[in-house]
Amino acid sequence: MKDIKVTDSVKYIGVDDHDIDLFESQYVVPNGVSYNSYVILDEKVAVMDTVDARKTDEWLANLEEALDGRSVDYIVVSHMEPDHAASLQVLAEKYPEAQVVGNAKTFNMIPQFFTFDLEGRKVVVKEGDTLSLGSHTLQFVMAPMVHWPEVMVAYETSEKILFSADGFGKFGALDADEDWACEARRYYFNICGKYGVQVQNLLKKAAGLDIEIICPLHGPILKENLGYYIGLYDTWSKYEPENEGILIAYASIHGNTAAAAKKLAEILEAKGAPRSEERR
């Protein structure tokens, strides 16, 4: 298991996938991707999401190491997409006493993916509901279409952790040495980009929470300078530019259009355009 610390009571049990060629069968991920999952160890134990079926065995080994002989009381399902929920049935059958936590839409979707019996095991939550684990309490915030209709996030009130589902995610395995913003930007616009209104709704809800740690389902755990990450999400979801300027995009077979584009850039700069950039 990766030695990644969230807090003393919250353990990272996710896995990296360097074997994947295309994320969701369409997005190139040269540095792989991480499937993040977490476990909260308190009087009650809660597993926060599962992982893709490609990595079930490795993930279960991580979970068992973190549990150190304990059992699971709650399985929290924030997102039903298979890269986060594919191992749900395996986990539910391994710990048959564990209750499954989700919203009404979650439980409408589970039978479409799995065959295990949910009778007597459902904890249905809605906006603002809480779940006490002992000294830790989860507060649930609905985040529909960020980026599936059943998505919800959870805020742990004692350690001020936001389990943000696909929000604040990033392409790239956790051992990738790369800038956060570049691959987070590409992830955002491919996965959540058309749901700007819904992301704005979530950001407004998050503004009322005292967040010190963000635990996404892809990419690194965020502990410092959270205003930077939240600010980028605010900009992206408003479809505003990160930097003021003018993009001149062109294709030029014989070089004439290129010359015209460069001349246009010179004119714009002379008129005080803050920045111009050529793209061929």
Regions found by a protein language model. Give the residues of each.
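Conserved small/polar residues in nucleotide/adenosyl-binding loops
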Residues: 278-279
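Metallo-beta-lactamase
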Residues: 4-8, 102-224
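Active-site metal-binding motif and surrounding structural segment of the metallo-beta-lactamase
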Residues: 43, 54-101
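Conserved beta-strand hairpin/beta-sheet module of binuclear metal-dependent hydrolase folds
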Residues: 3-65, 153-156, 160-164, 246, ...
